[in-house]
Regions:
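Glycine-rich, often acidic, oxyanion-interacting loops/wings at catalytic, nucleic-acid
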Residues: 129-182
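Short glycine-rich, Thr/Ser-proximal phosphate-binding strand/loop in the N-terminal lobe
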Residues: 16-39
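Gly/Thr-rich phosphate-binding beta-strand-loop-beta motif of the actin/hexokinase/Hsp70
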Residues: 2-23, 102, 134
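Short active-site oxyanion
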Residues: 6, 30, 50-54
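Short alpha-helix plus adjacent loop in nuclease-associated cores
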Residues: 77-129, 133, 167-174
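Short, basic/hydrophobic alpha-helical segments
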Residues: 36-53
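Short hydrophobic/aromatic-enriched beta-strand-loop microsegments
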Residues: 29-30, 72-81, 159
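Acidic beta-strand-to-loop metal/phosphate-binding motif
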Residues: 51-59, 102
């Protein structure tokens, strides 16, 4: 049945991927769950025809699956999840309907696409995001410590700047004295 052109919509999840295959007329040929494995998805979709293109929402982990499908020879587009949600005509929020919508938007050319960044760039983005999270955590801890000092009315010595060695040498014993006894 490889002569029929089909479009594939994928609703990505950690364990399973809902795969919807539609033909050029928009008829659903298949809409069922497959394992989160590119080979299983390719096998399922190609049973129904020649895959012209596939689409999935851009979300955490989706770019890796998209890259695996591209490596399998597919043309894959990542969809902007916010725009796709607004294009939906009914309130039905199921994996079945989401995969169907992606396949249909791709088929008619209305899929709001986002860029699939190369793996190297995705790794750099992930590294920057993790670093920013650590910076935010450090800032939050410092703010909590300063709030606890204010709450206990502990004032640092004049001329000692916060977070310097001198301030840290002062704060540890001062905080220990202010802490309640168990």
């Amino acid at each position: 049945m490889g002569s029929v052109s089909v479009f594939v919509g994928l609703d990505y999840h950690q364990e399973l991927v809902q795969v919807c295959v539609v033909d050029t007329a928009g008829r659903v040929l298949c809409n069922r769950a497959a394992g989160n494995d590119a080979r299983a998805i390719v096998e399922l979709a190609t049973r129904h025809g020649d895959v012209q293109a596939a689409a999935l929402d851009a979300c955490c982990g989706a770019s890796n699956l998209a890259q695996e499908l591209v490596d399998s020879g597919w043309s894959v587009s990542l969809a902007h999840p916010g725009f796709v949600a607004r294009m939906k005509q009914n309130p039905d929020k199921t994996d079945f309907s989401d995969a169907r919508l992606l396949a249909d938007l791709l088929r008619v050319g209305y899929l709001p696409k986002v860029w699939l960044a190369p793996e190297r760039l995705r790794r750099l983005r992930r590294l920057v995001r993790y670093r920013q999270q650590l910076v935010d955590q450090r800032r939050d801890v410092k703010l909590r410590i300063r709030a606890l000092l204010r709450e206990n009315r502990l004032v640092s010595p004049v001329g000692v700047r916060p977070w310097t060695k001198g301030w840290l040498n002062w704060v540890h014993p001062a905080a220990s004295r202010a802490a309640p006894s168990p």
